[in-house]
Curated annotation (Swiss-Prot):
It catalyses: 2 acetyl-CoA = acetoacetyl-CoA + CoA. This is Acetyl-CoA acetyltransferase. Keywords: Acyltransferase, Cytoplasm, Metal-binding, Potassium, Transferase. CDD domains: thiolase. Pathway: Metabolic intermediate biosynthesis; (R)-mevalonate biosynthesis; (R)-mevalonate from acetyl-CoA: step 1/3. The gene is erg10. Belongs to the thiolase-like superfamily. Thiolase family.
Length: 395
């Protein structure tokens, strides 16, 4: 078995569009194509040089067969390209990256594109009783986004109920969650103001129609929407007298991200300067209703796999499905909050489900470069009780 080192030679993401916002007219497959094309162009790699593509996507209904392949062909990759769509809910993009790394490590590929894409704005409604005709009574529409993206498959409850359970079990009050959310927004706003995201973002042209020029979207839409007074006063959503609100949870969004992974031999052959090396990963799972704290189980596994001590880690990216997720996992692992999500996260920037896992790897790689740091850990929880984590090293 081959066991080559795997490098990230390119990492990009689209801006994240608000729900029903600038990207509402673009399907997830189009956003994915833009990310893949942008990632390849950054390092001047020909589409025909790519061996395989893994792309995460969660709500695939109405997108057509194998969204990953549509993303690849839309980016100009040849029809011979092997493509796999990955659905591990919010961890899909990270799992796609892990699969890509494993494919290279086993000698089955030298160049892999991995990432994820989601258009939550375009998630359809289902009419499940209409296949053979409703026999009697009213016909209901089922929200595909809620059913397949944001609800527990086992008890049918929204993900926010699990967030409330997390807050209760780990004694995290409303004020702490609101404070974290405000911090996330301010960090994201600062990152935009200082152009910290500039390197990782590939702009997206959106057709406007009626003879008007296309609109060029270059930054995330959500961070500017902070209203501190409103955030602190909005009512809890999932539980009477609860602590989780629409304002301290992640938003619904559209976006995509893509990484170009490469074997050590191919990096040397092409004379490229990688962004980072993938040195380990780990995954974990527990009760579905406790998925919120699964990153605290996956991160130690990833560190062990990488042969890294927690004290060696410079920065963390823990996906902010809810403020309570980042707060709880930071608390459980005893992390320094000043080294977690330093440019904001899903609460302020957005959480397009299939993309977030690879998006945080992308962001982390640039943080390591900007901060002249060495080791970074990214982790993301996923519905059903799981989490994935990955360790990267700047080279």
């Amino acid at each position: 078995m081959v066991n080559t080192e795997v490098y990230i030679v390119s990492a990009v993401r689209t801006p994240m569009g608000s729900f029903g916002g600038s990207f509402a007219s673009l399907p997830a497959t189009k956003l994915g194509s833009i990310a893949i094309k942008g990632a390849l162009e950054r390092v001047n790699i020909k589409p025909s040089d790519v061996d395989e593509v893994f792309m995460g996507n969660v709500v695939s209904a109405n997108l057509g067969q194998n969204p990953a392949r549509q993303c690849a062909l839309g980016a100009g990759l040849p029809r011979s390209i092997v493509c796999t769509t990955v659905n591990k809910v919010c961890a899909s993009g990270m799992k796609a990256t892990i699969l890509g790394a494993q494919t290279i490590m086993t000698g089955n590929a030298e160049i892999v594109v991995a990432g994820g894409t989601e258009s939550m704005s375009n998630a359809p409604y289902y009419a499940p009783k209409n296949r053979f005709g409703a026999k009697y009574g009213n016909v209901e529409l089922v929200d595909g986004l809620l059913r397949d993206g944001l609800s527990d498959a086992y008890d049918g409850l929204p993900m926010g109920n699990a967030a409330e359970l997390c807050a209760e079990e780990h004694s995290i009050d409303r004020a702490s969650q609101d404070a974290f959310a405000i911090s996330s927004y301010k960090r994201a706003q600062n990152a935009q103001a200082t152009k910290a995201f500039e390197q990782e973002i590939v702009p997206v042209e959106v057709p406007v129609g009626r003879g008007k020029p296309n609109k060029l979207v270059t930054e995330d839409e959500e961070p500017k929407n902070l209203n501190e007074d409103k955030l602190k006063s909005v009512r809890a959503v999932f539980k009477s007298n609860g602590t989780v609100t629409a304002a301290n949870a992640s938003t619904l969004n559209d976006g995509a991200s893509a990484l170009v992974l490469m074997s050590a031999a191919k990096v040397k052959e092409l004379g490229l300067k990688p962004l980072a090396k993938i040195i380990g990963w780990g995954e974990a799972a527990q009760d579905p209703e406790r998925f919120t704290t699964s990153p605290s189980l996956a991160i130690p596994k990833a560190l062990k796999h990488a042969g890294i001590e927690a004290s060696q880690v410079d920065y963390y990216e823990i996906n902010e499905a809810f403020s309570v997720v980042a707060v709880a996992n930071t608390k459980i692992l005893g992390l320094d909050p000043e080294r977690v999500n330093i440019n904001g996260g899903g609460v302020a920037m957005g959480h397009p489900l299939g993309s977030s896992g690879s998006r945080i790897i992308c962001t982390l790689a640039y943080i390591l470069a900007q901060k002249d740091a060495k080791i970074g850990v990214a982790a993301v929880c996923n519905g059903g009780g799981g989490a994935s984590s990955i360790v990267i090293e700047r080279v």
